[in-house]
């Protein structure tokens, strides 16, 4: 059975995890973003957030079609998060820019399945895709 959380608790958890990711070096400045499923919508970190300026009131509720209200804009990567929620049963998405992953991506090729844990990514390898401008549909 899936445990249900209220909106305030989800916002607080997203904020705490965003700060944690930065504190352990998985994100720097405003790179990376986190979200969670919230009913038929998602809650996502705001555009321009950093570990030092994010708070639970800044987390943005967004429909999976990209509609939101309020003064804050969602992360520019909301489309990627929405696509994952539309296609899977995922309950949360964590997108980081860790130094090691960036270094691997700069090689321009996927990560081969050299260890059984690669299978946790859903295949026999971790694929690579060419760079595209962040926040676009591409």
For the regions a language model picked out, list residue spans one by one:
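Glycine-rich flexible loops
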Residues: 1-138
């Amino acid at each position: 059975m899936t445990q249900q959380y209220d909106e305030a608790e989800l916002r607080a958890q997203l904020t705490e995890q965003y700060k944690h990711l930065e504190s352990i070096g998985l994100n720097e400045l405003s790179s990376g973003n986190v979200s969670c499923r919230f009913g038929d919508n998602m809650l996502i970190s705001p555009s321009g957030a950093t570990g030092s300026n994010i708070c639970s009131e800044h987390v943005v509720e967004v429909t999976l079609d990209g509609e939101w209200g309020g003064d804050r804009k969602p992360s520019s990567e909301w489309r990627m998060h929405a696509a994952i929620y539309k296609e899977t049963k995922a309950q949360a998405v964590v997108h980081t820019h860790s130094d090691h992953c960036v270094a691997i991506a700069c090689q321009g090729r996927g990560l081969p399945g050299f260890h059984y844990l690669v299978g946790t990514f859903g295949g026999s390898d971790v694929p690579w895709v060419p760079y595209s401008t962040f926040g676009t549909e591409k």
